[in-house]
């Protein structure tokens, strides 16, 4: 038997062998019987448009542009009229077969060129299918197309007796088809292997199928030479089978309950997992924002610390200059000498101008000392403030660095793994 190529059939006739039509094919004996009865013209439930290749061939030729599942009747009528006219002209004219050289010599789109094209189309028109159908009917008298063509032409060529004879033959062929389909479907369902033989003669096929079934039964009887089963044993087997069936039903219901429970648990776990992912994502975003803020604050603090260090250096330079100037002033000033400051010294007493000069000098010295002392205290206070501020900034910088290290460590620990 030749292997059925479904892909080749799908390419040859995509509408007949489409995936949407698979459900229409009969797979069981009852469906096949109903399908065969619907194909019988004498049956009251005859299908007016059976699913055959000729029927779908019309769909391929005259498919409607608006709806591909319907036939464009206007297009089909026009095409059939054109085929009729071509066939009529072909029968009335001489059978001329133009050659390629004759066609190339003609002027394209001229009257002779169009006439030559019509002759070529007439020679390859599809109305010759009727003659081919007649030849196939003579070769395969048991085919469905032969029976239908015979029934269609019976009213014109035969009398009523011949029609009844054809009807009886159709009934006999229908019975043979029914028996054949019953044998094939049951043998497939029960695992009985029927030896392949040519399917041209259905009677031989049925005989071979019956012989295969009998041989299978005989071999089974030989292999299983067990004593006959008593009624009690049959009852026990039936009870065991019913118990097994109940156990299977119980196990099936348990599996359904377990499946439902696991499905709900999976949905709940998935919802919690999604919530955890959202929470971790939100926490990660907040920590990233805090880290950015800490980085910005750290950069500002470092900048301010650098400015304060520059100011501290300038203040130290000014303080050093002030200390050096004060030391030089104490070493070179006459007001600081003991002779000048000692009121009992002879020079201060005996000098005619010593009274007014020493008084003014002492006043200037005291005022200068006051100014110098206030300036020194001011700079010392500013210097101490700058030192305290610097110490405070250094402590904040250390705290920020520790916080940054802890934040990066926490991010590395809390970073969730990538999920699908």
Curated annotation (Swiss-Prot):
Residues 132-169, 323-363 are annotated as: Disordered. Changing residue 210 to M: In strain: CLIB 413 haplotype Ha2. Residues 157-169 have a biased composition (Basic and acidic residues). Changing residue 117 to T: In strain: CLIB 630. GO terms for cellular component: cellular bud; cellular bud neck; cellular bud tip; incipient cellular bud site; mating projection tip; polarisome; site of polarized growth. Residues 132-153, 325-339 have a biased composition (Polar residues). Changing residue 253 to R: In strain: Sigma 1278B. Residues 343-362 have a biased composition (Low complexity). One of its GO terms (molecular function) is myosin V binding. Present with 7820 molecules/cell in log phase SD medium. The keyword Phosphoprotein applies. Changing residue 249 to K: In strain: CLIB 556. This is Protein PEA2. Changing residue 384 to L: In strain: CLIB 219. Localized to sites of polarized growth and is required for efficient mating and bipolar budding.
């Amino acid at each position: 038997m030749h292997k059925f190529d479904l892909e080749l059939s799908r390419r040859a006739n995509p509408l007949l062998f489409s995936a949407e039509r698979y459900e229409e094919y009969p797979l069981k004996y009852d469906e096949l019987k109903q399908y065969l009865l619907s194909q019988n013209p004498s049956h009251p439930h005859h299908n007016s448009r059976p699913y055959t290749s000729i029927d779908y061939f019309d769909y391929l030729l005259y498919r409607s542009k608006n709806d591909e599942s319907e036939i464009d009747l206007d297009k089909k009528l026009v095409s059939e009229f054109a085929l009729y006219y071509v066939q009529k002209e072909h029968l009335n004219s001489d059978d001329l077969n133009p050659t390629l050289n004759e066609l190339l010599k003609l002027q394209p789109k001229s009257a002779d060129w169009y006439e030559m094209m019509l002759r070529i189309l007439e020679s390859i028109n599809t109305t010759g299918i009727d003659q081919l159908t007649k030849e196939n009917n003579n070769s395969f008298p048991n085919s469905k197309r032969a029976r239908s063509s015979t029934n269609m032409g019976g009213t014109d060529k035969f009398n009523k007796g011949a029609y009844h004879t054809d009807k009886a033959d159709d009934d006999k062929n229908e019975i043979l088809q029914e028996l054949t389909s019953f044998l094939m479907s049951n043998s497939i369902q029960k695992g009985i292997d029927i030896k392949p033989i040519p399917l041209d003669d259905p009677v031989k096929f049925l005989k071979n199928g019956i012989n295969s079934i009998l041989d299978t039964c005989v071999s089974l009887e030989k292999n299983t030479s067990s004593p006959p089963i008593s009624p009690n044993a049959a009852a026990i087997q039936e009870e065991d089978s019913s118990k097994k069936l109940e156990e299977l039903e119980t196990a099936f219901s348990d599996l359904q309950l377990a499946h439902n429970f696991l499905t709900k648990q999976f949905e709940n776990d998935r919802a919690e997992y999604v919530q955890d992912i959202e929470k971790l994502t939100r926490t990660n975003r907040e920590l990233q924002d805090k880290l950015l803020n800490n980085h910005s604050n750290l950069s500002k603090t470092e900048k301010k610390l650098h400015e304060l260090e520059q100011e501290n250096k300038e203040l130290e330079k000014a303080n050093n200059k002030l200390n050096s100037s004060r030391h030089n002033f104490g070493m070179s000033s006459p007001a600081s000498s003991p002779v000048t400051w000692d009121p009992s010294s002879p020079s201060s007493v005996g000098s005619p101008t010593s009274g007014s000069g020493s008084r003014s000098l002492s006043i200037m010295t005291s005022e200068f000392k006051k100014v110098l002392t206030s300036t020194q205290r001011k700079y010392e206070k500013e210097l101490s403030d700058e030192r305290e501020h610097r110490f405070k900034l250094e402590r904040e910088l250390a705290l920020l660095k520790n916080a940054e290290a802890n934040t990066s460590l926490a991010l590395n620990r809390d970073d969730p793994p990538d999920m699908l």
